[in-house]
Amino acid sequence: MTRMLIIGPPGAGKGTQAARISERLGVPAISTGDIFRANIKDQTELGREAQRYTDAGNLVPDSVTNEMVRDRLSHEDVSGGFLLDGYPRTVAQVEELDRILEANGVGLDVVLLLTADNDELVSRLLGRAQEQGRTDDTEDVIRHRLDVYDEQTAPVVGVYEDRGIVVRVDGLGSIDHVTERIMAALER
């Protein structure tokens, strides 16, 4: 059984690696983005509430996000483990995830932290923006996103480091090489 988080800066390849690792480990990859989209598409009560915030250009509050994650982690397919991407993003969400898992009688096994040099990430994200025609993703905007990530995520990583469950892996290199580094790190 593997219950894990994948954390890393924008452009580090979390989504790509989450899909590959979950397939190898035989556990579902769960991204908060997917949870939001599914709830909105299915017009669940939580989905309608989230959509009211996003339509107004506001961030969805923790209470709604937490409930969506709580609901998703109650599904049968996660009984053998999961790989969670995009949550928790704050120490308050760490505490909520602890409560959710405790209520299910389980805990986290590992927090996979993908690391990468910021200049490399900027280059990668600028290339992605160009491919996707996202003219709003300028270098300044990307660097700001990386700064926000650092500020928000450092305390989250700190909590899990104190618990001794963080595994750091360099997220740069070919997709296959990064996957192999992750699998090797998880086997230690």
UniProtKB/Swiss-Prot annotation:
Residues 31-60 are annotated as: NMP. AMP binds at T32, R37, N58, L59, V60, G86, Y87, P88, R89, Q93, R134, R145. One of its GO terms (biological process) is AMP salvage. GO terms for cellular component: cytoplasm. Transmembrane segments: none annotated. Pathway: Purine metabolism; AMP biosynthesis via salvage pathway; AMP from ADP: step 1/1. It is an enzyme of class 2 (transferase). Residues 127-137 are annotated as: LID. InterPro entries: Adenylat/UMP-CMP_kin, Adenylat_kinase_CS, P-loop_NTPase. Belongs to the adenylate kinase family. Catalyzes the reversible transfer of the terminal phosphate group between ATP and AMP. Plays an important role in cellular energy homeostasis and in adenine nucleotide metabolism. NCBIfam families: PRK00279.1-3 (NF001381), PRK14527.1 (NF011100), PRK14528.1 (NF011101), PRK14531.1 (NF011104), PRK14532.1 (NF011105). PANTHER family: NUCLEOTIDE KINASE. This is Adenylate kinase. It comes from Kocuria rhizophila (strain ATCC 9341 / DSM 348 / NBRC 103217 / DC2201). The lineage of its organism: Bacteria, Bacillati, Actinomycetota, Actinomycetes, Micrococcales.
